Amino acid sequence: ASVPQWAYTGQKRAIPEESKMRKVRLVPILALFFSLSALAGSPADQAWQTLADRFIDEMPALNPVGATHLGDHRFDGQLNEVSAEARAEEARFIRRYQAEMAGIDRAGLSRANQVDYALLAHELESSLWSMEQLQPWAWNPLEYTQLTGGAIYSLMAREFAPIEQRLGHAADRLEQFPRLLEQVRGTLVPARVPQVHAETAVRQNKGVLSILDNMVKPALGSLPEAEQERLVTAMEAASAAIETHQEWLENTLLPNAKGEFRVGPDIFDTRLAFALNTPLTREQIRERAESEFHRVRGEMYEVASAIYAEQYPLAKLPEAPDEAFRQVIIRAALEVAYKDLPPRDGIVETAKAQIEQATQFVRDHDLVEVPDDPVEVIIMPEFARGFSIAYCDSPGPLDTGQKTFYAISPIPEQWDDKQVNSFLREYNVYSMQDLTVHEAMPGHFLQLAHSGRYPSTLRAVLQSGTFIEGWAVYAEQLMVNAGYNDNDPRQKLIALKWLLRSVTNALMDQAIHVDGMSREEAMDLMVEGGFQEEREAALKWVRAQLSFTQLSTYMVGYLEHIDLQAEVREAWGEDYTPRRYHDTLLSFGSPPVQYVRALMLDLPIPE
């Protein structure tokens, strides 16, 4: 996952009057360049830039926690409103911008601005549909558990301001927790909440308390005594509000959670179009996923055969093996890789060493420009656990010079030895290499660092998850095909297994929510079809219930990147080099691949 799920969740609040008089702090040099270059363009470009700047100025006030993550710190002391009035205000905000955009001559815009215009139009339509039709505010309690955790974590994780100032804003937000959680209880409709969402919320709700213990309380000594007393009082009030909310989650929400987590074809297809922003339909995605499923398994057998032959040199493999035989050989080769496990408490240290190894490899092979931005491997905060094993938390587009966090979830303490071993087999040292490539180098960390250098702040805010996740999967295959980790065939086999995971994600995503795939069928697809360990598959089953369409972004984005690379290689001919291609590809920010394709190949910008 590229961005922690809490970053942009929760309903939003109306714009305070004082904020209307101030402009958001843009990335100084790039923002100035972008504005001046637009003002030197056509009248349409000038009108568009005025609108885009105003949107970036006004939008953060609607979501104070999201604003902090973006790097706009005007609202660090405020906490989101989740009331019906706040939703109505947001709807008016969206419709106002839709009406203003209709008055701009899109055809008269520069190509770069045509892309940004399309992205904002898409985002506004998607947000309005989600609020008024999907209505997650009524049935998804995770929007709120992650909002409370993100409210404090986003203030404390990065040193964007003096600690005294950040602690003061933490106190401001903590004082508002009782109001927020009371609004949440009045907003959620238990009968509409799926049981799996309620169960996960019960586990996540208290996560913010660990943030107070680990990030806020140790810094109390930085404050004068009076401010210390205020912060302690705010923490006590927030903790009491969280405990009250925990009782409601356990005694009211959970017993009455009767919602259906399967969303059905209509909602799935609409959300798919918004989430992926790709020309591909659900049916086309399934067809390509099924084809890729068989192709990747076939390649896994070829690699596994070589590993098996090295282990058993006297064994003779059949020339035309059936699927059952292929399954046995692939599993036998995977067992060889599973012998190399990281220590239970050493996953973070393993990842730190692997980032250095991967960075040096990228430089040595001149694959892509390596930014000098700081990155730190951390234990995933408790409030964010339960959705994915790892994520890359890059600084917001308005925060410059801040660290990127590569967060890894620890092994749950309640797991028995069998469950721990299953997890470590899945995340063996070769899998950890692939995970680090995906999340950090040259995956999310590198790509998002490049993205942050693009001068359009609007494009930085409206990133495409499909482009981002697709690049990370592409990066996995790029590295192993270039010989990463000493050309070890075990690394190649594990990288193919991870690619197969992306494919099964896409197959399972729509099969569960549209076709009614059962847990047993999903586990069989993952464990037998995808060679995943039981713990990984069980966690993925939960994740597939908690979300829909997001699991399709990995494979769809990867295939779009592969298709684009082939097109550009043919168009550039002898001028093509991996370094030139990758640097150019990543120079446009993180828009959907179809827009990057148009920009790289000088094609019409999709509307």
Language-model features: where?
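Extreme N-terminal basic, low-complexity initiation segments
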Residues: S2-A7
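Short, Lys/Arg-enriched N-terminal segments with co-localized hydrophobic residues
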Residues: Y8-K20
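Juxtamembrane/membrane-water interface recognition
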Residues: T9-K12, L36, R297, Q565
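N-terminal maturation segment of proteins
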Residues: E17-E18, A40-E607
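Bacterial N-terminal signal peptides that target proteins for export
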Residues: K20-P28
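Bacterial N-terminal signal peptides
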Residues: V27-S37
